[in-house]
Design a protein with these regions (language model features):
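Short post-phosphohistidine helix in the DHp/HisKA domain of histidine kinases
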Residues: 133-145
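Conserved phosphoacceptor histidine of two-component systems
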Residues: 19, 127-131
Length: 166
């Protein structure tokens, strides 16, 4: 293999791998231009490859997206959740650094809609269970406090114990 054939083979392998990812992958340069992106990235933003070679801002102009891009091109890791077409998309961006200079960024996009929905359901369920348990526990605690405080005649204690039991 010559050097050119080897480079071409490696490029094809990289394209094959990234095209088979569920996650969106975008590579940008230090000027925000899209150098490479897989089809999952285009699908998540609901665009076609017309943005290849253009600024990453052609995908989304939202303030939090712009801040994340500015942060990563400033040399820092950025992570946000975007709302895209009704879905929650986690954006994870890491700078590409050569020496001390940021040359661009690699952006990973993961659809976390179902994960966030499950977390919300779990939180809601926990809150409901907590509320449902607190109501009878408050009654039990109240009856026990009345008995302990000596406000109940000895012959009425079995009646209160029956209420607590029920």
């Amino acid at each position: 293999y010559g050097l050119l054939e080897l480079a071409k083979q490696q490029q094809e392998e990289f394209a094959l791998i990234t095209e088979n990812m569920q996650e969106g992958l975008i590579v940008i340069d230090k000027y925000t231009m899209i150098l490479s992106a897989n089809s999952s990235a285009w699908n998540l933003f609901h665009v076609d490859k017309v943005c290849q070679g253009e600024s990453v801002y052609c995908l989304d102009r939202a303030e939090d997206f712009r801040r994340a891009i500015e942060l990563v091109l400033g040399g820092e890791h950025a992570e946000i959740v975007l709302k895209l077409n009704g879905n929650d998309i986690q954006l994870i961006a890491n700078p590409v650094v050569r020496g001390a200079k940021t040359e661009g960024a690699v952006i990973l996009l993961v659809d976390v809609t179902e994960k966030l929905e499950r977390e919300n359901l779990r939180r809601e369920f926990s809150a409901n269970v907590s509320h449902e348990l607190k109501t009878p526990l408050t009654s039990i605690s109240g009856f026990a406090e009345i008995i302990q405080g000596g406000f109940v005649k000895a012959e009425d204690i079995p009646k209160f114990a029956g209420r607590i039991y029920k």
